[in-house]
C-alpha cells in the first residue's frame, strides 16, 4: 500500500521539522489538560522535596504528544532527558550502559516499551524499584552477581499497546496517563501556532479545515499543514486560504472526516460483511497490511468515533459506517 499522508508514524524526514515545531513550555502545549494539571502538581511537589519524579507511563495512539510532553517534563524538572526505543535495547548490557550514564533526577524515555524482552525487563525491575543494577558475571556455579547503585532517575515509558505490557512492569509505574485524541478547536490552535513558526500566513477557516481532517492527531495536523503550504507555494500564494487548502487536501486524498483510501477500504470490508464479524487476520490479508498497523494506526480513530465495534469474534461495522458508505444493512434473516 502506498505511503499514507495520515500515517501516524513519524517519517524520517520529519524528525528535525517536528523538533522545531515542538512546544517547549506548558503554555505552548495545547490539549491534554487533565494530564498537564496532574503533571504540574507532581513536578511542583517533586521539586519541593528535591526528589526525582515517580516513574510514569504514557499510552495511546501515535502522534498525540507523548515525546513532546516528556521533553517539557524534563525542562520543568531542570534535568536531562535520554531518548531511546525498546527495539534498540537488545541486551542487558545495552540497558546497563544507558542507566549508568544517567545523572540524579535525569529522565529516561523508552518508546515502544511494550517491546522490551522479558530478560531486559528483569534487569529493569530493581533499577526502577531500588535504583540498583544487578549484573551477573560468568555462568554456571561460578556466576556472580554484582550490584551497582544508580542515581535516582525517572523512567517514562510510552506505548501504543498498553495491553501488551507485562503486569510486573506496568505495576512499577507510579503514574499512568492515557493520551486522548484532540478536539478540532485544539488542533486548529496548534496549526496556527505552527504556521507562525513556519512564517506562513494562514486563514482561520483554512486552519479549521485542516484540523477537521486531522483525525484528532497533532502529528497529522502538522503534516497536512506543511503539505498545504507546498501547494500554496507552487501557486505563488503567500497566504493559505480556504480554496488552496481544500484543493490541496482533496488532492492528498483526505476527505472531510480525515479518512483516506485505506480507511475507506477497511470500512467497506466490514460493511460488506453485513453484520458478520471479520477477523483481524482476514482484514490484514485483504488489505495487504500487517495486523499491528491495522490495530495501532487504522482502527483507533475509527473506533473512538463509533465506526466499528470490536468483539471476541472480530470487527463489525456500525450503522454509522453503513450510512457513511451508503451500504444498506441487510435483515439478518436474509443472510442465511
Curated annotation (Swiss-Prot):
Catalytic activity: ATP + H2O = ADP + phosphate + H(+)
Pfam families, sorted: AAA_lid_4 (PF17864), RuvB_C (PF05491), RuvB_N (PF05496)
Localisation per UniProt entry: Cytoplasm
Binding site for DNA: 310, 315
Family: Belongs to the RuvB family.
Superkingdom, taxonomy of origin: Bacteria
Biological source species: Helicobacter pylori (strain P12)
One GO BP: DNA recombination
UniProt name for this protein: Holliday junction branch migration complex subunit RuvB
Top-level class of the enzyme under EC nomenclature: hydrolase
UniProt entry tagged with the keyword Ribosomal protein: no
HAMAP family referenced in this protein's UniProt entry, alphabetically: DNA_HJ_migration_RuvB
A single Gene Ontology CC term: Holliday junction resolvase complex
Annotated region described as Head domain (RuvB-H), given as residue ranges: 256-336
Alphabetized InterPro entries for the sequence: AAA+_ATPase, AAA_lid_4, DNA_helicase_Holl-junc_RuvB, P-loop_NTPase, RuvB-like_N, RuvB_C, WH-like_DNA-bd_sf, WH_DNA-bd_sf
Originating gene: ruvB
Binding site for Mg(2+): 67
Main location: cytoplasm
Amino acid at each position: 500500500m502506498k505511503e499514507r499522508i495520515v500515517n501516524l508514524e513519524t517519517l524520517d524526514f520529519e524528525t528535525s521539522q517536528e523538533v522545531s515545531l515542538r512546544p517547549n513550555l506548558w503554555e505552548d502545549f495545547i490539549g491534554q489538560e487533565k494530564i498537564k494539571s496532574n503533571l504540574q502538581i507532581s513536578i511542583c511537589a517533586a521539586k519541593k522535596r528535591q526528589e526525582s519524579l515517580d516513574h510514569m507511563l504514557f499510552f495511546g495512539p501515535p502522534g498525540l504528544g507523548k515525546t513532546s510532553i516528556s521533553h517539557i517534563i524534563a525542562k520543568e524538572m531542570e534535568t536531562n532527558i535520554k531518548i531511546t526505543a525498546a527495539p534498540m535495547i537488545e541486551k542487558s548490557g545495552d540497558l546497563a550502559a544507558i542507566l549508568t550514564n544517567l545523572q540524579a533526577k535525569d529522565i529516561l524515555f523508552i518508546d515502544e516499551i511494550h517491546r522490551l524482552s522479558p530478560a531486559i525487563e528483569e534487569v529493569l525491575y530493581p533499577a526502577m524499584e531500588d535504583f540498583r543494577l544487578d549484573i551477573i558475571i560468568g555462568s554456571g556455579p561460578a556466576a556472580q552477581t554484582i550490584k551497582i547503585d544508580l542515581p535516582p532517575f525517572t523512567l517514562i515509558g510510552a506505548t501504543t499497546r498498553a495491553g501488551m505490557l507485562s503486569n510486573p512492569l506496568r505495576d512499577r509505574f507510579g503514574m499512568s496517563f492515557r493520551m486522548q485524541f484532540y478536539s478540532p478547536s485544539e488542533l486548529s490552535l496548534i496549526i496556527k501556532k505552527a504556521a507562525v513558526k513556519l512564517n506562513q500566513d494562514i486563514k482561520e477557516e483554512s486552519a479549521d479545515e485542516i484540523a477537521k481532517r486531522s483525525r484528532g492527531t497533532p502529528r497529522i495536523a502538522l503534516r497536512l499543514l506543511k503539505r498545504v503550504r507546498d501547494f500554496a507555494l507552487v501557486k505563488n500564494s503567500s497566504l493559505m486560504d480556504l480554496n488552496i487548502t481544500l484543493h490541496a487536501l482533496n488532492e492528498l486524498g483526505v476527505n472531510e472526516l480525515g479518512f483516506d483510501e485505506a480507511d475507506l477500504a477497511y470500512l467497506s470490508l466490514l460493511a460488506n460483511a453485513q453484520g458478520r464479524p471479520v477477523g483481524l487476520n482476514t482484514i490484514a490479508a485483504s488489505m495487504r497490511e500487517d495486523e499491528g498497523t491495522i490495530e495501532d494506526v487504522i482502527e483507533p480513530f475509527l473506533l473512538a468515533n463509533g465506526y466499528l465495534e470490536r468483539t471476541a469474534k472480530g470487527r463489525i461495522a456500525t450503522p454509522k459506517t453503513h450510512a457513511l458508505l451508503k451500504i444498506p444493512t441487510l435483515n439478518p434473516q436474509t443472510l442465511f
